[in-house]
Amino acid sequence: MAAAVPRLTSGGAVRIRIRCGELGTTKWREGVIEIQERDNKINLLVKFNSGGAPRVFQLSHNVKSVSWFQTHGPNRMTLTLKDSCIVMMDKLNMLVAKKMKEYLETVKLGKPAVFKTNQGSASFGLVLGNRTAQNDSGLSPSDKQSAPRRSSLDSREDSTPRKPLGSPSRVTSTPARGSLSEIRSEKRKRLMNSDGDLTEDYPKENDSSSNNKAITDSSRKFLLSCKDKLKQSEENRASAPHTPAPLQPTSFYGSRTGAKDYTQTHSFLDRPSSTGSCPSAKRSLVLPNHSTPFKKVRPTLDYGGWNKPRPSVLAQPQPPLQGFSNLGNTCYMNAILQSLFSLPSFSNDLLKQGIPWKRVPINALLRRFAHLLAKKDISPPEVKKDLLRRVKNAISSTAERFSGYMQNDAHEFLSQCLDQLKEDVEKINKSWKNEPSAWDEPQSTRLADEVDTSRIYTCPVTVNMEFEVQHTITCKSCGEVVLKREQFNDLSIDLPRRRKTLPMRSIQDSLDLFFRMEEIEYSCEKCSGKAATVSHKFSRLPRVLILHLKRYSYNTQLSLNSKLGQQVLIPKYLTLLSHCTDATRSPLSLGWSAQNALSRTLKISQSVNSSTLRRASQRPESSGSVLCDSDSDEELVRKVARKHHPDDDRADELQQHHPHAAVEQSEFNGINDEEMLAAVLEMSRHDTSLCAGPDEEPSSSPDTGFGDADAHDLTQHLELLDAEKQPTDALESLDLTMDENKENQTPDGLQGELDWVQQYSLEQEREEQELQQALAQSLQEQEAREMREDDDLKRATELSLQEFNNSLPELLCSDEDSGNEDGLDMEYSEAEAEELKKNAETGELPNSFRLISVVSHIGSSSSSGHYISDVYDMKKQSWLTYNDLDVSRTQESTVQRDRDRSGYIFFYMHKDVFEELSELEKAGVNTDGGRTVLQPL
C-alpha cells in the first residue's frame, strides 16, 4: 500500500502540445495536466480528452525553464525539461497558471514542494487529494446500508445519525438493529480515544463517499500501525506454531487457522478489543485472512513491502539485442548499417538537429536512414525488415546495381550511402532556402528555434567522416610547388607485403605506405619538366577515419578476382602524427553546428568592412614558386564577406595603397576551422543556386526529388491523383478516337457512333479484367519467388561458410608472401618501431584514432561469402558482433585476433572524440547539445 499522492491539476480542459524525442511535435489537443508526488518524486501527467495512454514526464531535477506568456486572451505556459522535452499549455486560468508557475519554479530550484492541507483546493481552483470530493449527503439510506466495506465512515464526526453497516439480506448475529447501533457508537468512541491510528482504515481507497482531506500523516501512522501488528502476529505465530489461535484484533489479516465465516457482517472496527475471542469472532469482509491462497505473507519478521521502491517513470527495460534480417544476399548492407549506426556522433547529427522530415521526400535515403535508426531498437523484426527494404529501395533508385538480390561489395555500398546522404542534405538546404516553411501559429508564440527559416542543416557525413588531404607536387627540375586539396570519406589502402624475414605487418604499415612520398610523371607549366615528387598530408582530420583494406586482386591469367587471406595486425590505436603538419585542423567538436558557425562568421565579416581577407603570399627563398590549385581559407572567407558586403572590393584596392590597413586583418584570426566550414557550405549553396538558374529544375533520381510540401501525405496524394487521372485519360482517349471516327465515318446517322461507343466500353471492361488477373498472377509469382530466394539464401550461406572452413587450412599455409607484390615496404628505425608498437596499445601519440568497428568478409572468394560486423557499443561499453539478425557479445582482443585475415573495412574514431563520448555516456548526458529532436514519420 503506497502513501497518498498529492496532485495539482489544471481543473478544466486546456490545450496541450508536446515536443519530445518519442513523439516529435504533436498537434494542439485538449486535455488535463496533473502534477503528482510519490516517494519524493514529482511527475507531470498529461491526459488527453481524445483518449490514449497518459504521458508522464519526470519533474524532479529535470525542470530547465518555465515561461508564462500573459496575453489578452487565455494564458500560455511553456515548460522546458532537461531531457529536451517541451510541454506547452494554452487556455490556462490566470490563478491556476500563477500557482503552477510558482510550484514549477520551486521544483526547478530543487526545493521540496509538498502541498499542505491548509492550502485547500479552493484557494486556487485546483484539486488536492486522491480523488474528487463527493457529497455524502446525496446518498440514500439504502445506499449507505448496502456498503459494508465503507468502514472509513466511522472516522467522521458524529454530526448526523449513523446507519448500521449490515445488509438486510445477510444473516447477522446481533439481536436487534437498534442495539447494534448503540454498541457501534460506544465502540467508536472508545476506538477514537485509544487507537486513533485506525480511523483511516485500509478500505478507504475503495470508498467513493469518503471526504477528500489530505491524509498523508494519518496514512503514514496507519501503515506503521499495520506494520507493528504484522510483526506481533508473526511473533505470536512463531512462539506457538502448532496451537490454533483465535482471531486477534492485533492481527492485520487475521489468523491462519480461523474458520471461514462469510455470514458475519461486522466491519474491521467491530472486532472486540480483548485478547480472547469467542469462536464466532467477526472477520473483515474487505481484508482477507491468511487462509486465502493468494494473500500468503512471506515468513519474515521485518516486512518491507511498504517501503518497496517503485520503478522510475523514466527507467525503461533494456530491449534484447537484435540485428537486421537478411532480405536476400543483403549481409553487406546489414554490416555497413550496423557500423554506421554505432557511431553516436553520426546518429545525433542525423536525428537531433530538427530536420523537418515532412519536407523530405518519402523515398529519400536521408529519411529512410533516419527512420530505421530511430526504430531499430524498439521495433520487432518484421517492422525493421520493412524499413530495411525501404533503405535498399532508396539506394537502388540511384544505383541500380544494388537492386535485386545479387551479392555486392560492402565498400561500394558504403561509398554510395555516404555520397547519397551528402546529396540529400544539400538538396534539403536548397529547398529550405527557396521554400521556407510556414507555421500555423503567430510569430510571437513560436519558440526561438522555430522562427529561423534560413538555417543550414549539418550533413552527418561531412562533419563525421569527411577529411581533407593536401597534395604537394614539386617539380624536380625547377622546384615549382603546386598544392592540391582533395576531400575523402574513406581511404583505400593496400595490403603490406608479407615476407618471411619481416614480422607480421599491421594496418598502421598500410596507412604509412599510402602516405609515402612518390615520384610521378608531371608536366611542369613553368619549365616543361616531366618528373615531379608528390607528398600527401592531412589538412583537416575527421572524427571517424574509415579505412578500406584492399583484399582483392585481379588474376590476369585466369581473368578472375581472388581474395588475399594475408594476416594483418589490427592495432587498437592508429596515429597520423607523421602525416600531419602544424596547420592540420582538428576534428569538429561534438556540439558543432553549421548554422551557429555561419552566424558567427557573418557577424565577424559584418564588423570589419574595410579590411582585406587575403594574406600576402609567402614565397620561399629558393627559385621555386608556390601555386594553390584550390581556394585557400582566406579566399573562402573573402567570398562570403564579399557576398554580404560588396563594398569590400573597394577596400582591397585601398589596401594596396595603405599597407597599415592590414593590421585590421587580425580580427579575422578568430575564425576557427568550424566557422570556415560553415562559410564553405554557405558559399556552395549560393553558387549552386546561381548555377541552376531560375528556369532550371534540379536534377534528381527517381522517387528522390525534393519539393513536396508534405511528404507525410505524399503516398495518399499520389493515390488520389492516380484515381482521378484514370477516368480523365479514358475520356481524353475517347475524345481523340471519336474525332478520328468523325473524320472517317460515312454519313449513316448517329447509330454507328453509338455502336462504336458501346464497343469501346466493352473493350475497356475486358482490359480491366485482364489487368486485374495479371496483377493477381504477378503477386502470386512474387510470393513464390521470394520463398525460393529465401531458400537459395540459406543454401548460399551454408555453402559459403563450408567453403571458408574448407579453404582455411590452405589460407594458413599460403600467406607468406601474399601481399602487394608491386608495393614498397615501410622502413622504420628501431625507435620508431618501438614507439608505434607502444602507441598501438596506449594511443599516447598526438592525432591517434581508436578502433570502434570492423566489417569482415568471411569466405575465400571475392564473388561469394558473408559479411559480418563487430562494433563497439558506447552505451554498453562493450563489443558486439552483428551477424544479420544474430547479435552476440565479444571482446576486443577476440576481434583483433579473429579478424586479422577477414577484416575488410575498419572504423577508427579520434581519441579525443572517443573519450568525450565515453564520458558523456557514463554521465548519462545527451550529446545533442539541447537541439530539437524530430522523429522521422
UniProtKB/Swiss-Prot annotation:
Short motif D-box 3, span: 162-170
UniProt feature, compositional bias: Basic and acidic residues: 151-161
GO molecular function: cysteine-type deubiquitinase activity; cysteine-type endopeptidase activity
EC number in record: 3.4.19.12
GO cellular component labels: cytosol; nucleus
Position of sequence motif KEN box 1: 38-40
Span(s) of short sequence motif D-box 1: 76-84
Short sequence motif D-box 2: positions: 101-110
Catalysed reactions, as listed in the record: Thiol-dependent hydrolysis of ester, thioester, amide, peptide and isopeptide bonds formed by the C-terminal Gly of ubiquitin (a 76-residue protein attached to proteins as an intracellular targeting signal)
Active site per database record: C331 (nucleophile), H866 (proton acceptor)
Gene Ontology BP term (one): central nervous system morphogenesis
Keyword hit for Transferase: no
Span of domain UIM: 672-691, 766-785, 788-807
Enzyme class label: hydrolase
Domain USP as annotated: residue spans: 322-911
Keyword Transcription regulation on entry: no
Entry's family note: Belongs to the peptidase C19 family.
PANTHER family: UBIQUITIN CARBOXYL-TERMINAL HYDROLASE, UBIQUITIN CARBOXYL-TERMINAL HYDROLASE-RELATED
Protein name in UniProt: Ubiquitin carboxyl-terminal hydrolase 37
